[in-house]
Structures are given as structure tokens and as C-alpha cells.
């Protein structure tokens, strides 16, 4: 049979170049001159199977295993041997049909690498596979001249190893060693457990006394807790009721303020308008008075002229009088012309003033319209912001019902290291809002804490109060070195649609930057979904990518998108609420400023309109006066012409008088009209004065009412603060002392107290004193006694289990000993049947027998070999010659191969001490045994070579470098002769 199929070597000793030897026959001879490296095959086999002794490997150090170099070949950096075995008959302890084992070592390292079928392995695994096949140290599977000497000279106990390999009980021996080791460990453990049990009994007795005291402490403390919590909850609810009353009073007063303050502002604005109107009416009265004076002046002039005409009519004019009259008329015409020029200049100025006023009025109206539009827009924005405020309050209230993180923040005074939800610390531009919120997801509501201890404490608080679960971000334990590789960043920067990394667009305090980096430093922002897909492909789908619209491409290529209702976090709502409140305040301030500006503009506009009306009245008066003067001048000119060109005409004088009377009638009518207007205007002024007085009285009343409401509001707010402090103190005490929320306390401890308030507080003080008098309490004793008892029970069970294990292991050892003893003894009996036959064949007679040194203890007994060559009676093997010693060892080996064949035997010049006749017997018996065993024989003897199926030659064509080649048998004599001559 062929067990070793292939031998491959590289860099091992003299094998500088890689060589491969395929074994196809069961009896192969390896021949060659001394020093050619043929025995390196044996060293290689030992080395692969784990031989560590440098002496047995014919070396001084591990580096001696590696080719040292020659004149033509450099030194190798490593040595490598690989052996391939046929395991189709399952001779090895492995199920694979072919087993390849390899060992490799590097120069200078001293560390070996082992492989089984190219897979990394350990020496222990290799040794386990090759157990009981005769290739281990001390076995007859590898025999050299040194092995023969060892076999003969070895102590009986050392020689036993050979027979154990042959019997196959090595596996039992190893199993027994394992069981014995396990038994020893179990016995040690049993002793240790016994010591622990005794200590636990003492501890249990001590803890029992401590636990009884602790339980009494707990009973008193629980009574104190129940009573104090009931009192605190009752006081809290009472304070809450009073607080609600004050809040109602505050809301009512503020509501009244909202009603009365606008009324006061309206009245004050109305007074301004009424005063403006009164001033306008007063100015109009002055203008009418002036106009009335002008009418009276005109009437006087007309009456004077009438007197003149009347005189003319009664007396007539003489020529002398006419000349004097003409001169007087001429002078009068010049005076009237001067007066006319003055009125025309005033008229021109009045027209200019009216034009300027109309322009200013139009500009003022435009400003008023703009202000009104701004007020309308501001009002619309204010309505929107107030609606948004309502929505935010509703969302905030809804979120607070389930936001456990908020509860922890609210109760931060009862805990340590609680900061706030992550969202409250982050700021980012509106452009990236959807992307960053999508990237953060639920983590925006995670609770930031200082360290792991704070998180653990908060979790205990949540569990105790049955609140729910919260995810924590401990600042001292987050990994902040996560980032996109530089290589990928360079690629991303060159691609369209890349807008950066999320963490770069978030602003926060440096304290929270590690948290931001952990969550966002590997999340990319893309312009749109197409860009995101492209970026993902270029980065091998290693990163998560979010778009500006909130779509996501996950690592691995999964895409998420579509409409999504925003899930606002508490932090985000708080920020939005703050912005909303600021916007409302700003808009309300704007509204007040705009209304104030509008009132001022309207007052100015009224003033301008009054000025315009006044100028228009003046203009009308100037026009009317100009017409009158022109008419007088015309009449005077006509009269002058009559005086200078004609004599006195009585008829014309009469006509002039009639015309004067008509003018007087018109003037008197105008006088009456102005007097009527003055009367109406006076009545208007009286009415306005009355209205102003009534409004001022109402303002006084409203201010008094507001002062009264303000005083009530101050009192209510003081009461509110007082009860808020009471509520806060109670809440803080319940949080800090009892580690529970107020809501939980109300839900579980709102119970009636049968004692009065004073009695309840006295009992609380008494219970507290009772607790203080108990001294030091080991509260953990209750839990410890339970744990100790459990541990005692567990260890006692372990002790009993160990006792049972000891019995089982002892039983297993007995069974292993029986099986191993039987199998070993059967081998010895079979050997004693075969050994005499083999011995007689090799020696040509004589006797040989194997005996126990201690027959009563087969498992540990040494093995003696008693050999008597023909004609000799030898008491000690050391007395045999070298050839006889070799034959004895070979007799035992070949007998073992007949009884329990080894799959592979290596003989390294084992027959060198034999004479030719014995060499021939040696070769014949190997040939017979090769049917069941593969032999590798390193030999110089021709008799051995002739029986081999195949010969492998080893030679050094280059000094220091071994080459191998197949040698035909007809050439074997040539090599042998050359070797013998050497």
C-alpha cells in the first residue's frame, strides 16, 4: 500500500530548490553518497510532525533547518515541507480522503506555521491526526542506527511507548490523562467549594440579624414615605387649587385690561381728533369774524357813497364843484387801484399756497394709504403668527404627553448630568433643514447627558417611575472619529450635486461636536435624488446620502422617498416657539408704531385740510374783493369821465344810488349769512367742548378702573408666585428625596390623611427621629441574604454536582484502564506468538520473548525483551553485538507489523551493521510486510536495493544543493560500488 503519496520540500537544509517526490510503490529505497542529503528526508518527516529536538533533527538551531546558501545559491529566507497522505482507509484520525500537512519557518523568527490541506492549523491538531500510527517520538516507525541502540539500551518503561503505539491505546492514554486532569481539577474545585460553603454559612447567620434590622427600618421608612407623600400631595393639590384661582384672577384682569386699555387708547385718540376739530372750528370762527369785519367795512363805504349821491341829488353840482369832484375821484381811483394790486398779489400767493397744500395733502394721503397697507399686512402676519403659536402649543402639549426625555429634563434637579434633547443644541440653515432632520431622524430627540453614569441613573429613574424608554447620548463615550475617507471626499468634491457632509452644516457648541460627528459625519447631502444615486455609485454604496427634499439613499443602495409628515422634536418645537414669540412681539410693536404713525399723519392731514380750506376761503374773499374794487374803480372812472366830459346828469345819479342800495342789500345779506355761520360754528364748538369734557371724564374713570385692576393683578401675581414656590418646593422634595415625578406621586399617593395638618407633621417628625436612632443600617443585607442563600444553594448544588462528577470520572478512569489493559495485553500475547518466528527467521534459530516488569499492573509496567541467539544464553541485551542488536530490534518491529501494521515505516540505514546474509533476510521480510505497510529505506546495501520497487537517488551536482532523481535498478550496483569504494 502507498500511504505517503507525495513529498515536497523547499529551502529545507540542502533542498535549496523546490523538489517534489511522488511515491507510487510501497517499498522505496533512497540511495546516494554520504553527505548527499538523503537522510534529510527523514529529518523533514520528523520536522513536519512536530519534532522539536535539534539533536534528533541533526541541527543546532531552528535556522539550521533553512538552506544556508552555497557558492552558486543564495541563502533561503524560509524552509517549507509538505507531505501528502492517502487517507482513503481512514488510517488517520480525520474523515478527509487525502490529508496534506505542511510546516513553514522563516529565518530569524523561530516561529513555525502549520497547515492542514492549505488551511492554518496547530501542531496539536496535526499530532491528533497522526496519533497511534507509529511516527511519533520513541516509536519503531522510524528506525535508524540510533533507534536500534535506543531500543536496546532504553529502560523498560521507555521501551513501553513502542508497544503502546502498536496496540493503539495511545488514544486511551491521552483520554485517561484528560480525565485524570479533569478529576484533579474537580477535586481541587470540590475542596475550594467546601471552604466557600463554610464561609457562606457564617455570612448567612450574620446577614440574618442585619436583614431583620433593615426590614424594620424599611417598615418605618415606608410608613414615613406614605404619610409624608400623602401630606405633600395634599398640600400640592391645595396649592394647585389656589394657584388656579390666582391664574383665573390674573387671566380675568388681563382680559379686562385687553378690553379697557383699547377703550382708553380710543378715547385718547378721539380727544385728539375732537381737539383738532375744535381748533378747526375756532379758526373758522376767526375767519368768519374777519370776513364779517370786511362786510361791515364795505357797508360803511357803500353808505358813505350813498350819502354823497344823496347830496348830489339834493343840491346838484356847480362847475367849480365838478372840477373839484373830478380831482377827488381821480385821487380815489388811484387809491382803489393800489388796493386792487395788493389783493391781486395776495390772490396769486394764495393760489400758490393752495397748490403746495394740495400737493402735500396728496403726498400725505399716499403715506396714509401706505401705512394702512402696512398695517393690513402686519395684521395678517400677526394673525398667522398667533395661529402658528396655537398650533405649536398644541403640538408641544401633545409631544409632552409622550416625550419621556422632557420629563427627565424637567426633573433634572433630582438627577445629575442631564442636559437636554439634542435638537435644542443644534442650528442649521433653512436650506438644509429637511436633509439634516431626515439624517438625524429620531436621534434629534435623544437626550444628551454628561456621561454613562448619568444615563444609568436616568434609566433607573425611568424604570422606578414607570415612564418609558429614552435613548441617551453620553458625551464622554461617543466615538467622534468617524468620517468619510479622504479618497472618497476627493471623488465627491468633483461630482455635481454634492453639497457637503451633514456635520459641516450644523452649528453647535464644541462640547456637542463629537455627538454631531458620530451621527452626521458620514452622511452626505445631495442636491436631488438623481445626484444622490450618482454619489452613492461613485462611493461604492458605502455611505448614507440625503437630499434637500428629505429623500434618502442608504448604504447598500436602498432608496427611501415620498411625502413624509414632519415629526417635530421637542427641541425643534421649543426653538420654533421662541421664534414665533419673537415674531409676535415684533409684529405687535410694529402695529403700535404704525398706528401711532398713522394717527400723527392723519392729524397732520387734518391740519393741512384746515389750512387748505382757510386758503380757499381767503382766495374766495380776495376774488370777491378784487371784483368789488374793480367794479368801484369802473364806476369811479365812469363818474370821472362824466364830470370831465359832461355836465351833471341827475338821472345817472339816481341810477347810481339805486345800484348802491342794491349793493348794500347784498352786503347786509352776506352779513346775515356770516352771522348764521358764526352761530352754527359756535354751537359746534360748544358741542365739541362738551364731548371732550365727557371723554376726559371717561378717561379719568377708565384710568381709575385700570389702576384698581392693576393693583388686583399685582396682588394676584404675588399670590401666584407664593403658591408656585410652594408647588416647586414640594415637587423638588418629591423629586430629590423620593426620586419620582409629581405626576407619579399624585397617581399613586393621593390618599386621605385622617390626621390634622399639625398631627401629621408631628408624626412625620417622630418617624424621622425613629429612623435616625436606628443608626447604621445595612440595607443591602436583605438583597444580600437572598443572594447569599441563592449562592449557597447554587454552590451547594455545584458541590454535589462535583461529587457526582468525581464518581463519574473515577468510573471512567476505571473503564479506560480496563479497555487499555485488555487491548495492550492482547497485543503482547500476539507478539509473543509472532516474535519467536520472526526472531528464528532473522537469527536462524534461538528464542525471543516479551515480558512485563510488573505483570500485576499491565498499564504501567515496563517491557523487557529476552533474546537468546542460537547457542547463546544472554541475560542482558547490552551483551549482544551490534548486528545482533539490530536484528533484535528488527524482529520486534516486523512482529509488530504482522500483528498491527503501521501504515508507514522509515528505515535509515538500519541494516548497516548486518552481514550480507542477514541483509537479504532483512530485505525479504520487508518485501513481505510491504503488502500492508509502506517502507522508505535509506540504504547503502545492495541486498536491500535489489528488493526495492523503486530507487530514488540523492546527489549534490552543485556543492551543498541536493537533487533527487529516480534510479533504475540496473544502475544501482554502480552507485553501491562507488559508495563502498568511498
Swiss-Prot record:
GO terms for molecular function: ATP binding; ATP hydrolysis activity; DNA binding. Residues 171-231, 280-310, 337-377, 575-718, 753-822 form a coiled coil. GO terms for cellular component: chromosome; cytoplasm. Residues 416-535 form the SMC hinge domain. It is found in: Cytoplasm. ATP binds at residues 33-40. The keyword Cytoplasm applies. Keywords: ATP-binding, Coiled coil, Cytoplasm, DNA-binding, Nucleotide-binding. One of its GO terms (biological process) is chromosome condensation. Homodimer. Contains large globular domains required for ATP hydrolysis at each terminus and a third globular domain forming a flexible SMC hinge near the middle of the molecule. These domains are separated by coiled-coil structures. PANTHER family: STRUCTURAL MAINTENANCE OF CHROMOSOMES PROTEIN 3. Belongs to the SMC family. Required for chromosome condensation and partitioning. This is Chromosome partition protein Smc. It comes from Mycoplasma genitalium (strain ATCC 33530 / DSM 19775 / NCTC 10195 / G37) (Mycoplasmoides genitalium). The lineage of its organism: Bacteria, Bacillati, Mycoplasmatota, Mycoplasmoidales, Mycoplasmoidaceae. The gene is smc.
Amino acid at each position: 500500500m502507498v500511504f505517503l503519496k507525495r513529498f515536497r520540500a523547499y529551502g529545507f537544509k540542502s533542498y535549496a530548490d523546490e523538489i517534489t517526490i511522488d511515491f507510487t510503490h510501497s517499498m522505496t529505497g533512497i540511495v546516494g553518497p554520504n553527505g548527499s542529503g538523503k537522510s534529510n528526508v527523514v529529518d523533514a518527516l520528523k520536522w513536519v510532525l512536530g519534532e522539536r529536538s535539534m539533536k534528533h533533527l541533526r541541527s543546532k538551531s531552528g535556522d539550521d533547518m533553512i538552506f544556508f546558501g552555497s557558492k552558486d545559491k543564495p541563502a533561503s529566507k524560509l524552509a517549507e515541507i509538505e507531505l501528502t497522505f492517502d487517507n482513503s482507509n481512514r488510517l488517520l484520525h480525520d474523515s478527509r480522503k487525502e490529508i496534506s500537512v505542511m510546516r513553514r519557518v522563516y529565518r530569524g523568527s523561530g516561529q513555525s506555521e502549520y497547515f492542514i490541506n492549505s488551511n492554518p492549523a496547530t501542531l496539536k491538531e496535526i499530532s491528533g491526526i497522526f496519533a497511534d500510527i507509529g511516527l511519533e517520538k520513541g516509536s519503531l516507525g522510524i528506525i535508524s542506527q540510533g533507534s536500534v541502540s535506543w531500543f536496546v539500551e532504553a529502560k523498560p518503561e521507555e521501551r513501553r511507548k513502542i508497544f503502546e503505539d502498536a496496540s493503539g491505546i495511545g488514544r486511551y492514554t491521552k483520554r485517561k490523562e484528560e480525565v485524570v486532569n479533569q478529576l484533579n481539577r474537580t477535586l481541587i474545585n470540590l475542596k475550594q467549594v467546601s471552604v466557600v460553603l463554610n464561609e457562606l454559612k457564617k455570612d448567612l447567620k450574620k446577614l440574618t440579624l442585619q436583614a431583620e434590622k433593615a426590614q424594620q427600618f424599611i417598615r418605618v421608612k415606608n410608613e414615613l414615605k406614605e404619610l409624608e407623600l400623602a401630606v405633600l400631595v395634599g398640600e400640592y393639590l391645595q396649592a394647585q387649587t389656589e394657584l388656579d384661582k390666582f391664574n383665573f384672577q390674573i387671566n380675568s384682569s388681563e382680559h379686562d385690561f385687553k378690553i379697557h386699555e383699547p377703550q382708553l387708547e380710543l378715547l385718547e385718540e378721539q380727544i385728539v381728533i375732537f381737539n383738532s376739530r375744535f381748533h378747526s372750528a375756532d379758526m373758522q370762527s376767526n375767519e368768519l369774524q374777519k370776513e364779517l369785519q370786511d362786510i361791515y367795512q364795505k357797508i360803511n363805504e357803500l353808505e358813505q357813497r350813498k350819502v354823497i349821491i344823496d347830496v348830489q341829488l339834493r343840491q346838484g353840482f356847480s362847475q367849480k364843484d365838478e372840477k373839484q369832484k373830478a380831482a377827488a375821484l381821480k385821487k380815489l381811483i388811484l387809491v382803489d387801484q393800489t388796493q386792487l394790486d395788493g389783493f391781486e398779489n395776495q390772490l396769486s400767493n394764495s393760489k400758490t399756497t393752495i397748490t403746495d397744500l394740495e400737493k402735500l395733502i396728496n403726498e400725505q394721503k399716499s403715506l396714509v394709504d401706505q401705512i394702512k397697507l402696512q398695517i393690513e399686512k402686519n395684521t395678517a402676519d400677526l394673525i398667522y403668527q398667533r395661529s402658528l403659536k396655537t398650533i405649536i402649543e398644541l403640538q408641544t402639549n401633545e409631544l409632552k404627553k409622550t416625550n419621556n426625555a422632557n420629563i427627565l429634563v424637567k426633573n433634572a434637579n433630582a438627577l445629575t448630568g442631564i442636559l437636554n434633547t439634542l435638537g435644542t443644541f443644534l442650528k442649521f440653515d433653512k436650506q438644509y433643514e429637511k436633509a439634516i432632520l431626515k439624517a438625524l431622524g429620531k436621534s434629534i430627540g435623544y437626550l444628551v447627558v454628561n456621561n454613562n453614569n448619568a444615563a444609568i441613573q436616568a434609566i433607573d429613574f425611568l424604570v422606578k417611575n414607570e415612564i418609558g424608554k429614552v435613548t441617551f447620548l453620553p458625551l464622554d463615550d461617543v466615538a467622534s472619529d468617524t468620517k468619510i475617507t479622504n479618497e472618497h471626499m476627493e471623488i465627491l468634491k468633483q461630482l455635481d450635486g454634492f453639497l457637503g457632509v451633514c456635520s459641516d452644516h450644523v452649528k453647535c457648541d464644541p462640547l456637542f461636536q463629537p455627538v454631531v460627528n458620530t451621527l452626521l459625519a458620514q452622511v452626505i447631502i445631495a442636491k436631488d435624488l438623481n445626484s444622490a444615486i450618482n454619489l452613492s455609485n461613485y462611493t461604492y454604496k458605502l455611505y448614507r446620502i440625503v437630499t434637500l427634499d428629505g429623500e434618502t439613499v442608504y448604504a447598500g443602495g436602498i432608496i427611501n422617498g415620498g411625502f413624509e409628515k414632519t415629526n417635530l422634536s421637542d427641541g425643534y418645537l421649543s426653538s420654533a416657539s421662541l421664534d414665533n414669540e419673537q415674531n409676535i412681539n415684533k409684529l405687535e410693536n410694529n402695529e403700535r408704531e404704525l398706528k401711532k404713525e398713522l394717527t400723527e399723519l392723519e392729524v397732520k392731514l387734518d391740519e393741512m385740510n384746515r389750512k387748505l380750506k382757510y386758503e380757499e376761503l381767503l382766495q374766495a374773499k380776495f376774488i370777491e374783493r378784487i371784483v368789488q374794487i374793480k367794479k368801484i374803480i369802473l364806476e369811479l372812472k365812469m363818474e370821472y369821465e362824466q364830470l370831465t366830459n359832461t355836465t351833471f346828469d341827475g338821472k345817472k345819479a339816481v341810477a347810481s344810488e339805486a345800484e348802491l342800495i342794491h349793493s348794500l342789500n347784498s352786503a347786509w345779506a352776506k352779513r346775515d349769512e356770516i352771522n348764521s355761520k358764526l352761530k352754527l360754528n359756535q354751537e359746534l364748538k360748544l358741542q365739541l367742548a362738551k364731548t371732550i369734557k365727557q371723554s376726559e371724564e371717561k378717561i379719568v374713570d377708565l384710568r381709575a378702573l385700570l389702576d384698581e385692576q392693576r393693583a388686583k393683578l399685582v396682588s394676584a401675581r404675588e399670590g401666584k408666585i407664593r403658591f408656585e414656590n410652594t408647588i416647586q418646593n414640594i415637587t423638588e422634595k418629591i423629586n430629590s428625596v423620593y426620586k419620582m415625578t409629581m405626576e407619579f406621586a399624585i397617581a399613586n399617593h393621593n390618599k386621605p390623611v385622617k390626621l390634622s395638618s399639625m398631627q401629621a407633621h408631628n408624626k412625620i417628625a417622630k418617624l424621622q427621629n425613629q429612623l435616625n436612632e436606628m443608626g447604621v443600617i445595612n440595607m443591602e443585607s436583605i438583597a444580600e441574604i437572598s443572594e447569599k442563600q441563592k449562592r449557597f444553594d447554587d454552590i451547594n448544588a455545584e458541590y454535589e454536582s462535583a461529587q457526582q462528577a468525581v464518581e463519574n470520572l473515577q468510573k471512567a478512569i476505571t473503564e479506560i484502564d480496563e479497555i487499555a489493559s485488555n487491548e495492550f495485553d492482547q497485543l503482547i500475547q500476539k507478539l509473543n506468538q509472532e516474535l519467536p518466528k520472526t526472531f528464528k527467521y532473522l537469527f536462524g534459530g534461538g528464542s525471543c520473548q516479551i515480558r512485563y516488569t510488573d505483570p500485576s499492573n499491565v498499564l504501567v509496567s515496563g517491557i523487557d525483551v529476552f533474546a537468546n541467539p542460537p547457542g547463546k544464553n544472554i541475560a542482558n541485551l547490552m551483551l549482544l553485538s551490534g548486528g545482533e542488536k539490530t536484528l533484535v530490534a528488527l524482529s520486534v518491529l516486523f512482529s509488530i507489523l504482522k500483528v498491527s501494521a503501521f501504515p508507514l515505516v522509515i528505515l535509515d540505514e538500519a541494516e548497516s551493521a548486518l552481514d550480507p546474509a542477514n541483509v537479504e533476510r532483512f530485505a525479504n521480510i520487508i518485501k513481505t510486510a510491504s503488502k500492508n505497510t509502506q517502507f522508505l529505506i535509506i540504504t547503502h546495501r545492495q541486498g536491500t536495493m535489489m528488493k526495492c520497487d523503486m530507487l530514488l537517488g540523492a546527489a549534490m551536482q552543485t556543492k551543498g544543493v541536493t537533487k533527487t532523481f529516480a534510479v533504475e535498478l540496473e544502475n544501482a550496483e554502480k552507485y553501491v560500488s562507488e559508495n563502498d569504494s568511498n
